[in-house]
Amino acid sequence: MTAIEQGCIDIWIDEIVPCLKDTVTGDIKETVVFKIESRTYLKKFQKSNGWHINWNEIPKNVEVYALALKDDNTIQGLVGVRNDKDSHAAYLHWACTAPHNNKHEFGNQKYVGVGGHLFAIAADQSIEWGYEGAIHGFAANEELLRHYIDVFHAEYLGMLHQYQFFIDEEQAKNLLEVYHYEWNET
């Protein structure tokens, strides 16, 4: 199984903010979430232009959602989520901030709060699928696993992957109380 097929979460949670915050002005920006249905549209988000993976190559059973600014629909991050019926949870397949928000790879960022929003979107989908917010995924490394345990009170599972984590229903509800966005059903 390739890394794209398996999925992996390599995103830092920088600041817990209800909406996105501009790092220069401190302005708070409202956000919207929309599902990306077209694999052709996903070709815009490639590893070669800073999106960590080629998003059009993820498995077809993974739903992709975009977090965008409400005022101009500029995409700030993407999250891939799969309905994992066997685990009774949403599987957080991939999550990636836009290159202009990734200070770990590009040295600076336009907005803080993107990473937490992407986790909240996965929790939202879990509720939609009847799992009360439960989500699990594979952290990219031990440092990120510890980060998710510290920030989200995730639990270490390590059954399917050495850095597998689980966010239970209670912690997912806490996420959804903090992060605010609107759904854009286009």
Q: Which residue stretches match the model-derived regions?
A:
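Non-catalytic substrate-recognition and accessory regions of acyl/acetyltransferase enzymes
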Residues: 1-109, 117, 124-136, 143, ...
